[in-house]
């Protein structure tokens, strides 16, 4: 039987298909790293004062100098559309690899503070760049409350809760410890409801969960960078595999943590199946 030559697909068509696939992958990768995702969650507690039932808290973490829209306008509009009562900045506004200037944080902080009362704690990247005191002073002048190992009271509906914040452990060797701050909180506040803003997610279980806060709010973990089903992400910021405590709510020692997946990337890192997150927490009295 005579053999017939196999028909070959034109080489040009194969190249075109590969180019289209490459463009689709590039588009998806860009979308994964630059398309904002509003994540709405509810934190319920019977200890929450009635006046704070329905309070809206926007959490922004780990921007690392990222820009969403011209002058961050897309991010600012997204935050404003949530009508927040409070905005919490959970550290790493700046990035040591890009050497993000203070002006980035100050401009963003000023515009966020025009939307709602805004509170900030440092992350490890702030301390890897020069002159943290100057950054804190500039943010304060811009209308942002810097919680450097201290606490403030928040008021709503005739009730009060307490918000405390700690500097990143990469700060000064003699800075107040979280445990010392917690002692001050309990001395001033007794058994009242309080929140703790602290950058590092990986310190919740061993340390922050033992301080007595009702809710600890953190970032740092970048959602595990690559989100896979049934995992907390693939890679930690310390470059270990399958990290824990990277996104959402966790409970330890009668305390709850909310961990933001964050917004930006540090240096050569990236996101996959893990879009930049604007977290919107609704406090609920249950």
Identify the meaning behind each predicted range.
Residues 38, 54-56, 160:
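Short, mixed charged/polar active-site loops
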Residues 55-150:
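Membrane-embedded segments
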Residues 47-48, 65, 127-215, 221, ...:
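Conserved catalytic scaffold of divalent metal-dependent phosphoesterases
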Residues 50-52, 81, 112, 155, ...:
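Short, flexible hinge/linker loops that cap or flank conserved catalytic cores
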Residues 223-229:
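His/Asp/Glu-enriched short active-site or ligand-binding loop at hydrolase and phosphoryl-transfer sites
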Residues 1-51:
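N-terminal membrane-anchoring alpha-helices
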Residues 38-40, 60, 163:
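Hydrophobic residues on conserved beta-strands that form the core of alpha/beta folds
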Residues 53-57, 174-177:
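Short, charged, solvent-exposed linker or helix-capping segments at domain edges/interfaces
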């Amino acid at each position: 039987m005579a053999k017939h030559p196999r028909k070959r697909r034109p080489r040009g068509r194969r190249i075109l298909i590969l180019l289209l696939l490459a463009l689709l992958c590039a588009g998806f990768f860009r979308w994964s790293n630059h398309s904002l995702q509003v994540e709405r969650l509810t934190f319920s507690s019977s200890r929450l004062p009635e006046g704070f039932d329905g309070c809206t808290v926007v959490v922004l973490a780990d921007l690392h100098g990222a820009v969403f829209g011209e002058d961050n306008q897309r991010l600012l509009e997204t935050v404003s559309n949530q009508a927040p009562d409070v905005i919490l900045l959970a550290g790493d506004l700046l990035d040591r690899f890009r050497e993000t200037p203070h002006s980035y944080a100050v401009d963003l902080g000023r515009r966020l503070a025009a939307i709602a009362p805004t509170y900030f704690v440092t992350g490890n990247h702030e301390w890897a760049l020069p002159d943290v005191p100057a950054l804190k002073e500039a943010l304060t002048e811009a209308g942002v409350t810097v919680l450097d190992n201290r606490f403030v009271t928040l008021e709503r509906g005739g009730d009060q809760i307490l918000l405390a914040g700690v500097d990143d452990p990469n700060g000064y060797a003699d800075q107040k410890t979280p445990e010392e701050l917690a002692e001050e909180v309990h001395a001033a506040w007794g058994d009242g409801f309080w929140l703790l803003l602290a950058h590092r997610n990986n310190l919740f279980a061993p340390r922050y969960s033992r301080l007595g806060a009702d809710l600890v709010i953190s970032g740092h973990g970048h959602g595990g960078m690559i989100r896979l089903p049934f995992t907390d992400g693939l890679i930690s910021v310390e470059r270990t595999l399958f990290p824990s405590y990277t996104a959402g709510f966790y409970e330890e020692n009668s305390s709850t943590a909310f961990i933001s997946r964050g917004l930006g990337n540090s240096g050569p890192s990236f996101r996959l199946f893990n879009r930049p997150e604007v977290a919107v927490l609704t406090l609920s009295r249950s």
